Design a protein with these regions (language model features):
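Hydrophobic, membrane-facing alpha-helical anchors
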Residues: 19-27, 46-60
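Membrane-embedded alpha-helical segments in integral membrane proteins
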Residues: 18-34, 81-88, 156-159
Length: 183
């Protein structure tokens, strides 16, 4: 029984490591045209940021055996990574409106979804998905790591567009895509 528990923890930690490695490889593939920020690839920096936010939030979540801020941390990660991408790419300083509009669309979406999920979990007092997960340090860690991957991959199209040296052009395709968000 004792060895089985160790094997499960090692398997969960191996999955978490595999998730990070997979996402890192994905980031390297998609960021071939990314600008550098302070000497390294911006998309790669954002990847690390997404995971570090998750891992830092995991610590108090595991200590207190709570999932109450899991979803809001995901939203915060979307917002933080997009704001960092906009800042590091010079979007605000150079008024790259296409970058700013894409960033704002994701930020508004993250605030909307995050506040809904946060209010839901505080109303319900728990999220049943986590009942068996939050008691296992490795399974809970794997779950937080998966959220880092989820945030990075879901926002990767916007991140690589913002991190492109040319920025995001405002044209008919841009307007069509931006309008789809409001549907």
């Amino acid at each position: 029984m004792w060895m089985g528990g160790i094997v499960k923890h090692l398997a969960n930690l191996a999955i978490a490591a595999g998730v990070f490695i997979f996402t890192k490889l994905y980031a390297e593939i998609i960021s071939f045209n990314s600008i550098d920020f302070e000497g390294s690839n911006l998309v790669g920096q954002i990847l690390v940021m997404a995971f570090v936010i998750q891992w830092i939030a995991y610590i108090p979540a595991f200590v207190f055996k709570t999932e109450k801020f899991y979803d809001i941390t995901g939203s915060f990660t979307y917002i933080g990574t997009i704001l960092f991408a906009l800042y590091a790419s010079g979007s605000f300083q150079n008024l790259k409106l296409g970058n700013i509009f894409i960033g704002l669309a994701i930020i508004i979406w993250a605030i909307r979804l995050g506040s809904f999920l946060f209010m839901r979990i505080h109303k319900d007092k728990k999220d049943g998905r986590f009942d068996s997960i939050k008691t296992s340090f490795s399974q809970f860690f794997m779950t937080w790591t998966l959220q880092g991957m989820w945030v990075f991959i879901c926002s990767s199209a916007a991140l690589i567009a913002i991190a492109n040296p040319s920025g995001v052009p405002i044209n008919s395709v841009f307007i069509l895509g931006l309008s789809l968000i409001h549907i």
